């Protein structure tokens, strides 16, 4: 499977082995910068696949968080959470549709139950 080849390639890189080693030794928080937005989902999936710890991925804005969440859903459709910033909602528009509110509540419940591997949110 192509995904396995990607993960195997990453495992052979000293930089990623170093990241895994630091996390395993509880050296946290850990900041990984310099990644392209398209690489974030790959790295998050790699870390999630190699560690038995929950991962929190914080992006710089809401749009980036949603894109990263969508990319991660490809790898782990049932194990990724996205908590949308409540302040970005348009209350007048959403007054008739409670769909977004329901998704947020479901995500918060899953967060409380620790029913996830990767949590994606923005710093906003």
Predicted regions and their residues:
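ASCE RecA-like P-loop NTPase motor cores
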Residues: 1-124
């Amino acid at each position: 499977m192509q995904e396995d080849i990607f993960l195997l390639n990453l495992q052979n890189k000293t930089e990623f082995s170093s990241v895994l080693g630091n996390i395993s030794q509880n050296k946290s928080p850990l900041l990984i910068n310099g990644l392209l937005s398209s690489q974030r989902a790959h790295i998050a999936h790699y870390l999630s696949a190699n560690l038995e710890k929950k991962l929190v991925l914080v992006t710089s804005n809401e749009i980036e968080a949603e894109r990263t969440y969508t990319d991660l859903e490809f790898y782990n459709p049932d194990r990724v959470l996205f908590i949308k910033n409540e302040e970005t909602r348009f209350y007048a528009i959403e007054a008739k549709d409670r769909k977004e509110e329901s998704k947020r509540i479901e995500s918060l419940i899953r967060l409380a139950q620790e029913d996830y591997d990767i949590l994606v949110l923005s710093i906003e």
